[in-house]
């Protein structure tokens, strides 16, 4: 799930697949 970094309260990291787009994922 693609989420907003600010809205994310859990662990945030940039996924390798969305690295070039800078998509933030929560796990």
From Swiss-Prot:
Q: Which residues form a coiled coil?
A: none
EC assignment: 2.7.1.4
Query: How does the record characterize pH dependence?
Result: Optimum pH is 6.5-7.5.
One biological process term in Gene Ontology: carbohydrate catabolic process
UniProtKB keywords: ATP-binding, Carbohydrate metabolism, Kinase, Magnesium, Metal-binding, Nucleotide-binding, Transferase, Zinc
Record's note on what induces expression:
Induced by sucrose.
Source domain of life is Bacteria
Catalytic function, reaction form: D-fructose + ATP = D-fructose 6-phosphate + ADP + H(+)
Q: Which GO terms describe its molecular function?
A: ATP binding; fructokinase activity; metal ion binding
Q: Which cofactor does it need?
A: Mg(2+)
Query: What's the record's note on cofactor binding?
Result: Divalent metal cations. Maximum activity was observed with Mg(2+).
Q: How is its activity regulated?
A: Inhibition by zinc ions.
- Similarity annotation: Belongs to the ROK (NagC/XylR) family.
Q: Tell me how this protein assembles.
A: Homodimer.
Protein name in the entry: Fructokinase
Gene transcribed to yield this protein: scrK
